[in-house]
């Protein structure tokens, strides 16, 4: 949004990508996780870091280790009471849109509300996110330069998503790329190639590709030396062939 909004605004909003204010694990959040998974955290995980490794507007992510398998995982947890807050936000948007439209005849943004409603429904259902991630993962099995963390179905619900833990750094962290011997231009080329394939080949597109949702790993077996990691699969769009062929 740097080309649309003032820098002072975008600098403030960028923290919502993965460094938003988090919710303490004790109390309502821990209770919600246990209710969703059907057991105390101590029975499911041998380790569960109470400090989130990332926090955004809808959820926060904790690093943990599954007790039975020893697998290190990332547990994405939806904030408690978020669904009711979203209902209130949508109502406020409807009132504001109607009021502005009443006073300004040229204001024609009523289409935004249904769009936000559809997006909210998708992003508040982590099982839908799981289905999206599994679909996009299957689409890119032929490529070694892109990775989608796999989801542990038995530990995932509408409000809790448990997935393979993947390390890496943000795609806008040029210093980290240079430090690891990666070429930023080659990383950018991979991103363009991956999203171009989503749009023109599969017609199934990740619609929230901000730097908090795209990571880079070093990967010795690729000639480029890197691998793109796609995160947060809550919001996708299917593109009709007629739309894709227009481009």
Q: What function would you assign to each model-found segment?
A:
Residues 1-196, 216-241, 245:
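Broad phosphate/nucleotide-binding scaffolds in NTP-utilizing and phosphate-metabolizing enzymes
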Residues 199:
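Glycine-rich phosphate/oxyanion-binding loops and their immediately adjacent helices
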Residues 203, 208-210:
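Conserved catalytic-loop position in the HRD/HxD motif
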């Amino acid at each position: 949004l740097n080309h649309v909004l003032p820098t002072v605004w975008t600098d403030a909003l960028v923290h919502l990508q993965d460094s938003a204010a988090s919710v303490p694990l004790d109390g309502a959040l821990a209770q919600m996780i246990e209710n969703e998974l059907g057991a105390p955290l101590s029975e499911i995980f041998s380790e569960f870091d109470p400090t989130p490794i990332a926090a955004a507007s809808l959820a926060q992510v904790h690093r943990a280790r599954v007790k039975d398998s020893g697998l290190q995982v990332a547990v994405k947890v939806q904030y408690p009471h978020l669904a009711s807050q979203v209902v209130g936000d949508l109502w406020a948007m409807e009132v504001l849109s109607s009021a502005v439209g009443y006073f300004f005849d040229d204001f024609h943004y009523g289409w935004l509300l249904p769009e936000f409603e559809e997006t909210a429904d998708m992003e508040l259902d982590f099982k839908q996110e799981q289905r999206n991630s599994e679909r996009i993962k299957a689409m890119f099995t032929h490529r070694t330069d892109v990775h989608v963390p796999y989801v542990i179905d038995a530990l995932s619900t509408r409000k809790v998503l448990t997935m393979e833990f993947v390390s890496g750094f943000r795609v806008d962290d040029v210093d980290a790329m240079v430090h690891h011997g990666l070429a930023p231009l080659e990383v950018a080329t991979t991103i363009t190639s991956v999203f171009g394939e989503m749009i023109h080949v599969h017609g199934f597109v990740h619609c929230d590709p901000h730097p908090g949702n795209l990571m880079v790993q070093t990967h010795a077996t690729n000639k480029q030396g890197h691998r793109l990691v796609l995160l947060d699969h809550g919001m996708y769009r299917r593109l009709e062939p007629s739309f894709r062929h227009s481009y």
